[in-house]
Amino acid sequence: MRIEQELKLGFKDVLFRPKRSTLKSRSQVNLTREFTFKHSGRQWSGVPVIAANMDSVGSFEMAKALSQHGVMTAIHKHYTVQDWADFVKDADSETLNKVMVSTGTSEADFQKTKDVMALSDELIFICIDIANGYSEHLVQYVQQVRAAFPDKVISAGNVVTGDMVEELILAGADIVKVGIGPGSVCTTRVKTGVGYPQLSAIIECADAAHGLGGRIIGDGGCACAGDVAKAFGGGADFVMLGGMLAGHEESGGEIVLKDGESYMKFYGMSSKSAMDKHSGGVAGYRAAEGKTVLLPYRGSVHGTIQDILGGVRSTCTYVGAAELRELTKRTTFIRVLEQENNVFGKEK
């Protein structure tokens, strides 16, 4: 047993220090990033925000909506191959280039991924997604997928430390997904005692990934636009959002009527709700590691994504970053004990 004494930080523990800026307007800020990925050699351009691959967020409808803003969607893995075929038939190139095909690590998952990727050459992202990215099996699976898809962009996770980021990149991942337990409907940290404060995880994992020419996704923990900006400031190349994009018309969640009001069900992908729906219930050897909540129905996602991107643009103007890629270089975080004045309640 050992204890690491260094303090680890989450988004609530810091604020940006403002810096001199020559920008006159938020409209001058360019949020588009261009990446060339290490293993696939693929070039990609877009706004590096990703809707999470949860079945009450990462829907085909969400992908169509967010692609209009240059934003990505990781499609949840519970659609059938026929569902994908119907989607590909109707989707334009811009949408197809902004989606990730999510998969688990079983042989059935591998075959399904091959079937889906064969539907269109314009599907270029594969997201290998398991809760515990420290499994040796994940490394072997990344190698298997890389061998089968040498020209596709592969994301793998989730992990929170630089050593495993390096191992996954060396195994063939272009992008590593970072985050264990920070999500709004995740209870892994409570059920297992395992986790890592998300901002520190991003800072440390970005350093490891960039040293090898890889990229990271900061996955989870964002509760507001300022948190998204902090993730980018900490070095995340992409930021994945679940709860912030849940509850919308395009989210794909179940709508529930309660006391005359409309709500949408939102749950973690290791929750009892998810396992009841997709696995026939919680297996006898495990515990559910997620919660189920009802969110007030929020209408179209377009207003929400505009608000998030507007907040990030504003961050850039405060620190003098004309482009999103400059934000991490312009970032100085200050440690704080407060974030906002809640005398009239929190912002909705």
Swiss-Prot record:
Task: Output the Pfam families linked to this UniProt entry.
Answer: IMPDH (PF00478)
Instruction: State the EC number(s).
Output: 1.7.1.7
What is the top-level taxon of the source organism?
Answer: Bacteria
Instruction: Report the Gene3D superfamilies cross-referenced here.
Output: Aldolase class I (3.20.20.70)
| One GO cellular component term | GMP reductase complex
Q: Name one GO biological process term.
A: purine nucleotide metabolic process
What's the protein here called? GMP reductase
